[in-house]
Amino acid sequence: MHSMISSVDVKSEVPVGLEPISPLDLRTDLRMMVPMVDPIMREKQLQQELLLIQQQQQIQKQLLIAEFQKQHENLTRQHQAQLQEHIKLQQELLAIKQQQELLEKEQKLEQQRQEQELERHRREQQLPPLRGKERGRERAVASTEVKQKLQEFLLSKSATKDSPANGKNHSVSRHPKLWYTAAHHTSLDQSSPPLSGASPPYKYTLPGSQDAKDDFPLRKTASEPNLKVRSRLKQKVTERRSSPLLRRKDGNVVSSFKKRLFEVTESSVSSSSPGSGPSSPSNGPTSSITESETSVLPSSIQAEHLVSQQRLLIQDESVNLLSLYTSPSLPNITLGLPAVQSQISASSSFKEKQKGETQTLRPGVALAGQYGGNLPPSSTHPHVALEGKPNSSHQALLQHLLLKEQMRQQKLLVTGAVPLHPQSPLAAKERGSPGVRAAHKLPRHRPLNRTQSAPLPQSTLAQLVIQQQHQQFLEKQKQYQQQIHMNKMLSKSIEQLKQPGSHLEEAEEELNGDHSMQEERAPASSASIRAESSSAGEDDRIGQQVGAVKVKEEPPDSDEDTQTQQMESGEQAAFVQQVIGKDLAPGFVIKVII
């Protein structure tokens, strides 16, 4: 606007009558001739020119805006068209890519199908010769051996039916499992040669006694390779069963002396009938089970077995400790057990006692690999409580350990000296004198007997030890409660005696009556120490102050509690002296009856 105004000012200086195109007149004469224009007219002209210029500017603005809008619309249209074209191109590219991927997948699938078809063709080409070879092998195996074995089995079966020894076969049929366990040393291979001319090359019993799994020779479709495989499997099973690692599952303690006894007894029993094979199991050790009513081993044979068993226990160094398992897979712990010499001496004493008891033994059931019968509990040892089981080694272990503990306790009570080895933690801990207890407080190292270790058998021994500990604890608790009760009653009686006006004559009469009653009851001895004290009566006279305290002690039943009761009597005497030393009322009397 300032530029326009300046231009208007410039134009106002030019005279109106003159045209702008006309050349300027520089003459001064003419100017003097032109009359002067009025200022009012000049202002009007200027205003008109300003209005015209403003109108022109508005028109130009409108034109410019219209052109700008047109160009903007054109540009937006072009841009949209370009965007649409770009989107179309992208869509086309995506479609092309998808088509290419689909084509590639189809090609891969076709290739896989072709490869599978080729593999099928190759397999089909290779299978016919293999099938032919297998058929040829199956046809090449001859079944004549199977037929021969079946014929031999039928012939032997008919021969056994005709044999007169039917009772023995019936006895074996009752216990087929025992026959198999007793004769496990025989060969299980069906192709093995027979041991005698009359017996077949394999074990059998009456029909129905065996299980269905053991009847594999009767299969009509069985071939020679199948029989070989099954016989090998059976041999492996028997080897595994005979291994010492898997016998621990039965829970029985198996040792070397058992095996020796089994061999000795088997040889001695089988020597009576030398011509017997595996087909006559009545001569084995199981015949004593089925025919115990008719034919029973005499007691002298069982006594010899027991004596030989004890000799083997003493001589064999590998069976020094009866309380330990002899399996080589697990080590044994010998903590709390004595040395070898004490155990051998205890076992020898046990052997001498068993010699006297063999005359009264009842013939028990002897399983395969277990001999010795059932040992009844001896009357001289009431603490031994054995269960009625066929495991003689376990019973011998219990008796041996209990005898050892009894001998140790007797030595401690008689001599009162310190033992060679400290007591086991399961035994009674506080039965000895105070000097023995002080000696036991210091730990002593003992040389180990064996390098193997295994947990001790958790059986009746542990139960007996736990019962002993429980009884000792109950006795101590009773004694402690009795002492507390006696102290309370003494303190009460002292307080009542100090008070004036207490009636003491009736209390003295009651005490005399109680004393006479207790002297009558004295022959019937009891195991516990009773302390009775009388409370002051209500009707005693004033001026007489006479008190009485009575402590009655009776001899204990057993020699084991003598030391503890002596200590308690010493404590009671000290307590009575303390009571006497106190400032009591005049005329106070203490009566102690022992």
Curated annotation (Swiss-Prot):
Residues 113-143, 187-247, 265-297, 495-571 are annotated as: Disordered. Its EC number is 3.5.1.98. It comes from Gallus gallus (Chicken). Transmembrane segments: none annotated. It comes from the Eukaryota. Residues 143-193 are annotated as: Interaction with mef2. It catalyses: N(6)-acetyl-L-lysyl-[histone] + H2O = L-lysyl-[histone] + acetate. PANTHER family: HISTONE DEACETYLASE 9, HISTONE DEACETYLASE 9-RELATED. Residues 211-222, 236-247, 512-522 have a biased composition (Basic and acidic residues). One of its GO terms (cellular component) is histone methyltransferase complex. It holds the Pfam family HDAC4_Gln. This is Histone deacetylase 9. Gene3D superfamilies: 6.10.250.1550. It is found in: Nucleus. InterPro entries: Hist_deacetylase_Gln_rich_N. Keywords: Chromatin regulator, Hydrolase, Nucleus, Repressor, Transcription, Transcription regulation. Residues 267-288, 523-536 have a biased composition (Low complexity). Devoided of intrinsic deacetylase activity, promotes the deacetylation of lysine residues on the N-terminal part of the core histones (H2A, H2B, H3 and H4) by recruiting other histone deacetylases. Histone deacetylation gives a tag for epigenetic repression and plays an important role in transcriptional regulation, cell cycle progression and developmental events. Represses MEF2-dependent transcription. It is an enzyme of class 3 (hydrolase). Belongs to the histone deacetylase family. HD type 2 subfamily. Its main location: nucleus. One of its GO terms (molecular function) is transcription corepressor activity. GO terms for biological process: chromatin organization; heart development; negative regulation of DNA-templated transcription; negative regulation of transcription by RNA polymerase II; regulation of skeletal muscle fiber development; regulation of striated muscle cell differentiation. Homodimer. Interacts with mef2.
